[in-house]
């Protein structure tokens, strides 16, 4: 369990009380598939020169699910780990938010399945489709629910992107991976918890990265599947790179301004783990020192909404109580988000 400071006991749903001051992180969890595909193997499969992927992305291996694994399996593992660290029984959770772009099925949503398997008998559950920014959008919504309802919320980011990438396209198959991370938030009257959130969207470039078919605009047909339209398509990688790097830096500045803080107050910056070059460009624009940047994309790849909760869980040993964490992400849509958390 993470260090506790003035955490309040969740009240029954019928009780009335003033909103809690903060939504604090009580526990974190991670789930990665056992199989890792080295970038050298991906290069051989795609006919790329040795070292091509590592030089351009910083990714040296990607966790990939087996044939019998799905998003819900990873989400359940990560959620169970977060609950265990928080030392909370499943009955204490009032809401589950699952940030994913790869639900088990188009219908129904996957969150209720995850809630059932985790034994969350008193929780609402819903999916959030915010692409790479989805986990931060979910944190922002969870923050309000925790404080208003004075209950605990389980937030999970989980994806199986290997099933949505074109295996013959290096722009996507060399980047995207599978994984899940989870955070338990609970009401607190102390200083720990979510300090500020900032959310943004620019739909003018919605098709920078998208899956052409499978929705109401272009339903799936055998012909569209044969053309690979059910897989991810990146229209212009360079344009997306520029927008994402600038967007992450801008989101970080906006949330700091909103909180009345500056970069010197931040102990750790945890960006969406898109690829090493994008993180470095966003870091340069933001002005964050490398020594205070969390970057583990080399071993987890890009699992979209899962990368930030994975970083929180896998690197938690580096964070000290009271540290201010800056989380930033930009995702397809184009969605951007930033969250400040006092650890």
UniProtKB/Swiss-Prot annotation:
Q: Which GO terms describe its molecular function?
A: 3-oxoacyl-[acyl-carrier-protein] synthase activity
Catalytic activity from the UniProt record = malonyl-[ACP] + an acyl-CoA + H(+) = a 3-oxoacyl-[ACP] + CO2 + CoA; glutaryl-CoA + malonyl-[ACP] + H(+) = 3-oxo-6-carboxyhexanoyl-[ACP] + CO2 + CoA
Source taxon at top rank: Bacteria
Sorted alphabetically, which InterPro entries does this protein's record hold? ACP_syn_III_C, ACP_syn_III_N, BioZ, Thiolase-like
Stated EC number for the protein is: 2.3.1.-
Q: Give the start-end ranges of region ACP-binding.
A: 273-277
A Pfam family this chain is assigned to? ACP_syn_III
Tell me the active site. Answer: 132, 272, 302
Query: Quick check: keyword Transferase in the entry?
Result: yes
Sorted keywords for this record are: Acyltransferase, Biotin biosynthesis, Transferase
Is Acyltransferase there in the keyword field? yes
Enzyme group, top EC level? transferase
Q: Which GO terms describe its biological process?
A: biotin biosynthetic process; fatty acid biosynthetic process; secondary metabolite biosynthetic process
Look up the record and name the pathway of this protein: Cofactor biosynthesis; biotin biosynthesis
PANTHER family, per the entry: 3-OXOACYL-[ACYL-CARRIER-PROTEIN] SYNTHASE 3 (PTHR34069), BETA-KETOACYL-[ACYL-CARRIER-PROTEIN] SYNTHASE III (PTHR34069:SF2)
Q: Which family does it belong to?
A: Belongs to the thiolase-like superfamily. BioZ family.
Its function, per the record, reads: Involved in the formation of the biotin precursor pimeloyl-ACP. Catalyzes the condensation of glutaryl-CoA, an intermediate in lysine degradation, with malonyl-ACP to produce 3-oxopimeloyl-ACP.
Q: Mind telling me what this protein is named?
A: 3-oxopimeloyl-[acyl-carrier-protein] synthase
Q: Which gene encodes it?
A: bioZ
